[in-house]
Amino acid sequence: MKKLALLGSAGVIVVSALVACSSASDGPSLPPGPDKDAADFKRDGSGYDSATSPESGLGELLFRPNSVYSGTDGTHTFKVPVAVYDADADLTVTASDAAGITLAKTTLKNPVDPDGVTDNGKYFLITAKKAGVYTLTATSKGRSTTASVTISSYDPARYAAGKARYEAAGSGPDRPCTTCHVNGGAIDHSPAALATATDQEIGIIITTGVKPGPNVIQITSEPGTLHKWNVTDPQKDGLVTYLRSLDPRGFQ
């Protein structure tokens, strides 16, 4: 694949623009300087750009993605999607600890992407119940494959702090996140788009306007303006939690 795919080919997960308040597109890599330094954090194997997955369903049983992240605070519901490719009707998907995460089958609202490619993945929504690292195992046609699910523990107060900043303007010219992610282009930054992003990575996008690569995220309607916001640490942590709690977009 051209980029590490988040899920399949239906285009429901477009992540080059996500997290706190913008319609964005990739810009060039950062030049040397403080912003570049801020973006040079250690990668942990995750990635969160979706792209068409041409090899999906061509003979290899696999999860897409094979490593996802979510959280739980004991109060709100947190879900994250995952798909299995090249599975037959005998597909079974199990979790290493059914008390920690649960699985429910789901389907895409629009399984055919703008290029006419049909996403043939079998989708599941994972609901987080308790913090921990879990293994999903998919079995079909005598083959097995696995994926990891990392669930973080959040203080319930983080949700309220994140929701407040999401819906209200920040300091200076910083706008509410709803300006571009609910209204305007309604750019997806639900768990469908952020499944493979760690909490650290989401926080870096919010505060630096840079996504792993690193690539600069620019607001397309405002040339030269980065997707970079002034937030306090509680607001940043709250936004991470709140975004994790959104309903994954693009599913029935």
Regions found by a protein language model. Give the residues of each.
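Beta-strand-rich structural segments
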Residues: 59-91, 136-138, 162-165
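Low-complexity "stalk/linker" and mucin-like segments enriched in Ser/Thr/Pro/Ala/Gly
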Residues: 58-66, 95-122, 214-216
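The canonical Cys-X-X-Cys-His
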Residues: 162, 169-184, 202, 239-243
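A short beta-strand micro-motif common to beta-rich folds, especially ectodomain repeats
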Residues: 130-142
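Axial heme c-ligation environment in periplasmic c-type cytochrome domains
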Residues: 184-194, 208-246, 251
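Electrostatic cytochrome c docking/interface patches
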Residues: 148-171
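Bacterial Sec-dependent N-terminal signal peptides
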Residues: 4-8, 12-70
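Extracellular/luminal low-complexity segments enriched in Ser/Thr/Pro
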Residues: 118-131, 226-228
